[in-house]
């Protein structure tokens, strides 16, 4: 028992700054939604639709770069710090290439939005404008993630926390300026949220680079000599590790994003209620997601040290702490769901729908916690392909079809509207949690030699 208590302390020491950083990041979305909602319900719905396309695209790049964290943690644990700088430099090259692709996709996303059935033309125009403003922040966001992954792989999670709050503090006044048109700036409404967020991502990246250049603990990494040219072999390995993570994130996020697109023809009330419930549940999700990042660091570091038993301890401790956190957040969500909805919008119909959907969100929080921490554990073991297969099966084969049938057809019951999709979320996330745990048990029962050989790749 003592080893689990000690490991829990180490995990929380890593996870708490990550939690705070993620809260700051998610709070930026909260601020965008609230401030756009204060301008008009149409602008809030436009931000919701635009975000439903932005998130799958940018999180694909984010997932690709997550391969850096276990790679750096394993190199750090095995005492091979001299190899870290080269990995980071290749991460920046990879981020640059991916950001160009993402920007092209987002620029042309208007075709998707305007092809939605029965979508209001004014709503579509605002959503397209929001995306075309936001896409200029894609390189800044991905470059920031490379720098952050470097710090977190070295078990330094506080810098990401500090930069997250800097971003949040900058986002609020810049939102105000561009949404309402102050200090000589144009009044852009929801599009102003995109302008503000793009600017904030570049501020966060530049602030993180400034920290890394001054950090004494990273002097040996920073001082590596040589020209930062693309290294195809290293980039190929990062892609091999990161692509399954990216696709897994893509499949998970598109479960939510596609639902937002399917809900949009149902009307502004349904879109707004769904967005409020989804935005708040995302705020609660930062707890297990941040703990998963800490577990990845600890598992990768322990495997770098050659200790498979300590890696198991880190994994099990992370799961126990995550379930406890999820239970508390579920109770909080159920108890205060109506008051939470009122923070976003005072339309009675929107508040009623959002409060109802939050009940369903509370149901899946425990299984969601298990599946995301399970994914973090598998990343630590560098077993990323299994994450891809599990998420595809859980979200696209089980979750989304189930939600569609319940929400929009009468094959099982009368069409349930947004609530049917949320039941689909429960089915998908619970299935993912079960499969993640089965895969983890399989890996941990392999001979130590094989586990360490896989981790050192």
UniProtKB/Swiss-Prot annotation:
It is found in: Cell inner membrane. GO terms for molecular function: antiporter activity; xenobiotic transmembrane transporter activity. It comes from the Bacteria. The chain crosses the membrane at residues 11-31, 53-73, 93-113, 127-147, 160-180, 189-209, 243-263, 276-296, 314-334, 350-370, 387-407, 418-438. The keyword Repressor does not apply. Its main location: membrane. GO terms for cellular component: plasma membrane. GO terms for biological process: sodium ion transport; xenobiotic transmembrane transport. Pfam families: MatE. Keywords: Antiport, Cell inner membrane, Cell membrane, Ion transport, Membrane, Sodium, Sodium transport, Transmembrane, Transmembrane helix, Transport. It is a multi-pass membrane protein. The keyword Zinc-finger does not apply. InterPro entries: MATE_fam (IPR002528), MATE_MdtK (IPR050222), MdtK-like (IPR048279), Multidrug-R_MdtK (IPR022913). Coiled coil: none annotated. HAMAP family: MdtK. Belongs to the multi antimicrobial extrusion (MATE) (TC 2.A.66.1) family. MdtK subfamily. Multidrug efflux pump that functions probably as a Na(+)/drug antiporter. PANTHER family: FMN_FAD EXPORTER YEEO-RELATED, MULTIDRUG RESISTANCE PROTEIN NORM-RELATED. NCBIfam families: matE. This is Multidrug resistance protein MdtK. It comes from Escherichia coli O139:H28 (strain E24377A / ETEC). The gene is mdtK.
């Amino acid at each position: 028992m003592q080893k689990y208590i000690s490991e829990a302390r180490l995990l929380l020491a890593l996870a708490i700054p990550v939690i705070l950083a993620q809260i700051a990041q998610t709070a930026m979305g909260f601020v965008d939604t609230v401030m756009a909602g204060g301008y008009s319900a149409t602008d809030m719905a436009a931000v919701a639709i635009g975000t439903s396309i932005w998130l799958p695209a940018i999180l694909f790049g984010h997932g690709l770069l997550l391969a850096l964290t276990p790679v750096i943690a394993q190199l750090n644990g095995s005492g091979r710090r001299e190899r870290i700088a080269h990995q980071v430099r290749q991460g920046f090259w990879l981020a640059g290439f991916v950001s160009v692709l993402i920007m092209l996709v987002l620029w042309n996303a208007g075709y998707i939005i305007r092809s939605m059935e029965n979508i209001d033309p004014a709503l579509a125009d605002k959503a397209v404008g929001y995306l075309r403003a936001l896409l200029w922040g894609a390189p800044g966001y991905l470059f920031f993630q490379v720098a952050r992954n470097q710090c977190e792989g070295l078990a330094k999670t506080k810098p990401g926390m500090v930069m997250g709050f800097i971003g949040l503090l900058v986002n609020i006044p810049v939102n105000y300026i561009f949404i309402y048109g102050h200090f000589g700036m144009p009044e852009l409404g929801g599009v102003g949220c995109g302008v503000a967020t793009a600017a904030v991502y570049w501020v966060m990246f530049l602030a993180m680079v400034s920290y890394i250049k001054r950090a004494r603990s990273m002097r040996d990494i920073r001082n590596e000599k040589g020209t930062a040219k693309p290294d195809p072999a290293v980039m190929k390995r990062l892609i091999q590790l990161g692509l399954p993570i990216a696709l897994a994130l893509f499949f998970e996020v598109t479960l939510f994003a596609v639902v937002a697109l399917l809900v949009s023809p149902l009307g502004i009330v349904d879109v707004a209620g769904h967005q409020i419930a989804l935005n708040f549940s995302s705020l609660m999700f930062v707890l297990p997601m941040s703990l998963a990042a800490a577990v990845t660091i600890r598992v990768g570091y322990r495997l770098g040290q050659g200790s498979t038993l300590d890696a198991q301890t880190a994994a099990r401790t992370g799961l126990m702490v995550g379930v406890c956190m999820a239970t508390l957040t579920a109770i909080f969500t159920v108890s205060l769901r109506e008051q939470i909805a009122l923070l976003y919008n005072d339309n009675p119909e929107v508040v009623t729908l959002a409060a109802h959907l939050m009940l369903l969100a509370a149901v899946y929080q425990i299984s969601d916690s298990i599946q995301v921490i399970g994914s973090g554990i598998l990343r630590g073991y560098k077993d990323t392909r299994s994450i891809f297969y599990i998420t595809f099966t859980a979200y696209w084969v089980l979750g989304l079809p189930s939600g569609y049938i319940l929400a929009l057809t009468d094959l099982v019951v009368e069409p349930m509207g947004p609530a049917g999709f949320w039941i689909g979320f429960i089915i998908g996330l619970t299935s993912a949690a079960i499969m993640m745990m089965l895969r983890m048990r399989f890996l941990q029962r392999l001979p130590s030699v094989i586990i360490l050989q896989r981790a050192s790749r």
